[in-house]
Swiss-Prot record:
<feature type="binding site">
    <location>
        <position position="350"/>
    </location>
    <ligand>
        <name>Mn(2+)</name>
    </ligand>
</feature>
<dbReference type="InterPro" id="IPR009015">
    <property type="entry name" value="Fucose_isomerase_N/cen_sf"/>
</dbReference>
<dbReference type="GO" id="GO:0008733">
    <property type="term" value="F:L-arabinose isomerase activity"/>
</dbReference>
<keyword id="KW-0119">Carbohydrate metabolism</keyword>
<feature type="binding site">
    <location>
        <position position="306"/>
    </location>
    <ligand>
        <name>Mn(2+)</name>
    </ligand>
</feature>
<dbReference type="InterPro" id="IPR004216">
    <property type="entry name" value="Fuc/Ara_isomerase_C"/>
</dbReference>
<comment type="pathway">
    <text>Carbohydrate degradation; L-arabinose degradation via L-ribulose; D-xylulose 5-phosphate from L-arabinose (bacterial route): step 1/3.</text>
</comment>
<keyword id="KW-0054">Arabinose catabolism</keyword>
<feature type="binding site">
    <location>
        <position position="333"/>
    </location>
    <ligand>
        <name>Mn(2+)</name>
    </ligand>
</feature>
<comment type="subunit">
    <text>Homohexamer.</text>
</comment>
<comment type="function">
    <text>Catalyzes the conversion of L-arabinose to L-ribulose.</text>
</comment>
<keyword id="KW-0479">Metal-binding</keyword>
<dbReference type="InterPro" id="IPR024664">
    <property type="entry name" value="Ara_Isoase_C"/>
</dbReference>
<dbReference type="InterPro" id="IPR055389">
    <property type="entry name" value="AraA_N"/>
</dbReference>
<dbReference type="InterPro" id="IPR038583">
    <property type="entry name" value="AraA_N_sf"/>
</dbReference>
<dbReference type="Pfam" id="PF11762">
    <property type="entry name" value="Arabinose_Iso_C"/>
</dbReference>
<feature type="binding site">
    <location>
        <position position="450"/>
    </location>
    <ligand>
        <name>Mn(2+)</name>
    </ligand>
</feature>
Length: 500
C-alpha cells in the first residue's frame, strides 16, 4: 500500500442536453469504457472514479463543490466529449480548489472515412468542445493542465500519471505538519522565512517543539526495542569494527538507535511527516541525529538541517511525488567544488544527513566518527556513494512577496577516487550547462545552499509543481545563458510585482 491508495481522481464528462438522450447514453458508455481501461491498463498511480455527466450548471457546480469537501478527491480530470457551453462551468470552476486536468481526447482514434456523418460529428466534438473549455479557463485566469492524445496512447497515460502524482502531493501537503526541533541556525538568512505565508500558499504548517520534549520520548525507549533495531542495522549495513559488538563505538550505535526510535515515536504521535534539527540546539541528546535522520528520510519523511523548514517540506512533497518511481530523493547541500578545465564538479553532502534512497546498490557502511560541530558524542551515520545518471537539485526560497523554486538539472557521476578520510555520504555531479554558469545563475536567483536532490523526478515534474501551486520557477539547464537568465529574473520581478 502506498500513499496513492488514500486518494482518487474524479473523471468528469462535460456535455449538454442539446443532442438528446441517445447521444448522452453513448457518451456515458464511452466514459465508462475509457475509465475502466485507464484504471486497468494505464498504470496510473491512483484510481480514476467516474462521476455523473455534467450537462447543466447545477450539475457541474455540485460536482465541483463535492470535490472540494471530499478529502479523498485529489483532483478532477475533465473530458469535453461533446460541446459543453463553458458558461455552465463558471460557478463550479470559481469555487473549485482542487487541481484540474483537461484530457483533450476522443473515443475513436481514426476517423471512419466511409461512414462519418453528422451524428458522428455531434457525438465526438472534443476538438472544439475542448477549446470552449480552454477559453473559460483563460478568461477566468485559472491555469489548468492539458493533456492531448488518444486515451489508449501510452504517452498520454504517462502524462496523466505524472499530473496525478502532483495532485496527490498537493492534497497531502494540505495536511502536512512540519516539526522543528529547536529553532533556526543562528544568523542564517535563507533557512528562515514567513511560515504564515507558506501555510497560506502551500497548506503545510510549521511549528517548533523544544528538544527537551523529544529527549523525554527518546529516554522512554526500552533497551529491548533498541537492541531489536540494532539487529536490523546488523542485517542491512556493513558495520565497521568500531560499531560491532565489543567495538569501542558500540554504545554510540545503541544511542543512535534510541534516538531513531524516539524521533519516530514523537513524529508519529504528533502526525508529523517532516522535521528539522539544528546542531546548535541539542540539549539532552547525546549525539547529533545522523543515522536516525537518514533512515527516517528513507521511510518518506521530509528533513532539512539547521531549522530549514522550507527544504524539509519540499523534500516531503517530492518524496510523495516520487513514490514508486525508480531512483531516490534526498536532502542535499552543495558543499565544495572540483575545478578542472572541462571537468568541473560539485561534491554534495551534509554533516551526516543524506538519504540512503540515492545510494549505490551495495550495502552502506555504518560507522561512528568524530564530528567537531555540535559538541556532543561522536554520531553514527551511513556512508555511501550515490547512483549515477541524470538528476535535479531544487531549492524553494522566500522572496518576501512570493516564493521562487530554483531547479538545476545535473548529471551525477562516479566518484573517481576513494575518500578514506571523508566519513559521510556524498554525491558528485556535473552542473548543467557548466559549473560557472550554473553557480552564477543560482547565486543571482538567490538559491539556497540546501537543496532537494532527486534521481526519481525531473524538470517537467518540478514545472508542474510550480504551476499547480502558482509560484515562480527558475530553471538552470543546458539551455541556460546568463544574459537571458538575468533578463528572465527582471521580467519575473515585473510580472509578479503587477500581480501583488
Amino acid at each position: 500500500m502506498t500513499i496513492f491508495d488514500n486518494y482518487e481522481v474524479w473523471f468528469v464528462i462535460g456535455s449538454q442536453h442539446l443532442y438528446g438522450p441517445e447521444t448522452l447514453r453513448q457518451v456515458t458508455q464511452h466514459a465508462e469504457h475509457v475509465v475502466n481501461a485507464l484504471n486497468t491498463e494505464a498504470k496510473l498511480p491512483c484510481k480514476l472514479v467516474l462521476k455523473p455527466l455534467g450537462t447543466t450548471p447545477d450539475e457541474i457546480t455540485a460536482i465541483c463543490r463535492d470535490a472540494n469537501y471530499d478529502d479523498r478527491c485529489a483532483g478532477l480530470v475533465v473530458w469535453l466529449h461533446t460541446f459543453s457551453p463553458a458558461k455552465m462551468w463558471i460557478n463550479g470552476l470559481t469555487m473549485l480548489n482542487k487541481p484540474l486536468l483537461q484530457f483533450h481526447t476522443q473515443f475513436n482514434a481514426a476517423l471512419p472515412w466511409d461512414s462519418i456523418d453528422m451524428d458522428f460529428m455531434n457525438l465526438n466534438q472534443t476538438a472544439h468542445g475542448g477549446r470552449e473549455f480552454g477559453f473559460i479557463g483563460a478568461r477566468m485566469r485559472q491555469q489548468h493542465a492539458v493533456v492531448t492524445g488518444h486515451w489508449q496512447d501510452k504517452q498520454a497515460h504517462e502524462r496523466i500519471g505524472s499530473w496525478m502524482r502532483q495532485a496527490v502531493s498537493k492534497q497531502d501537503t494540505r495536511h502536512l505538519k512540519v516539526c522543528r526541533f529547536g529553532d533556526n541556525m543562528r544568523e542564517v538568512a535563507v533557512t528562515d522565512g514567513d511560515k504564515v505565508a507558506a501555510q497560506i500558499k502551500f497548506g503545510f504548517s510549521v511549528n517548533t517543539w523544544a528538544v527537551g520534549d523529544l529527549v523525554q520520548v527518546v529516554n522512554s525507549i526500552s533497551d529491548g526495542d533498541v537492541n531489536a533495531l540494532v539487529d536490523e542495522y546488523e542485517s542491512c549495513y556493513t558495520m565497521t569494527p568500531a560499531t560491532q559488538i565489543h567495538g569501542e563505538k558500540r554504545q554510540n550505535v545503541l544511542e543512535a538507535a534510541r534516538i531513531e526510535l524516539g524521533m519516530k515515536r514523537f513524529l508519529e504521535q504528533g502526525g508529523f511527516h517532516a522535521f528539522t534539527t539544528t546542531f546548535e540546539d541539542l540539549h539532552g541528546l547525546k549525539q547529533l541525529p545522523g543515522l536516525a535522520v537518514q533512515r527516517l528520510m528513507q521511510q518518506g519523511y521530509g528533513f532539512a538541517g539547521e531549522g530549514d523548514w522550507k527544504t524539509a517540506a519540499l523534500l516531503r512533497i517530492m518524496k510523495v511525488m516520487s513514490t514508486g518511481l525508480q531512483g531516490g530523493t534526498s536532502f542535499m547541500e552543495d558543499y565544495t567544488y572540483h575545478f578542472e578545465k572541462g571537468n568541473d564538479l560539485v561534491l554534495g553532502s551534509h554533516m551526516l544527513e543524506v538519504c540512503p534512497s540515492i545510494a549505490v546498490e551495495e550495502k552502506p557502511i555504518l560507522d561512528v566518527q568524530h564530528l567537531g560541530i555540535g559538541g556532543k558524542d561522536d554520531p553514527a551515520r551511513l556512508i555511501f556513494n550515490t547512483q549515477t545518471g541524470p538528476a535535479i537539485v531544487a531549492s524553494l526560497i522566500d522572496l518576501g512577496d512570493r516564493y521562487r523554486l530554483l531547479v538545476n538539472c545535473i548529471d551525477t557521476v562516479k566518484t573517481p577516487h576513494s575518500l578514506p578520510k571523508l566519513p559521510v555520504a556524498n554525491a558528485l555531479w556535473k552542473a548543467q550547462p557548466d559549473l560557472p554558469t550554473a553557480s552564477e545563475a543560482w547565486i543571482l536567483a538567490g538559491g539556497a545552499h540546501h537543496t532537494v536532490f532527486s534521481h526519481a523526478l525531473n524538470l517537467n515534474d518540478m514545472r508542474q509543481f510550480a504551476e499547480m501551486h502558482d509560484i515562480e520557477i527558475t530553471v538552470i539547464d543546458n539551455d541556460t545563458r546568463l544574459p537571458a537568465f538575468k533578463d528572465a529574473l527582471r521580467w519575473n520581478e515585473v510580472y509578479y510585482g503587477f500581480r501583488r
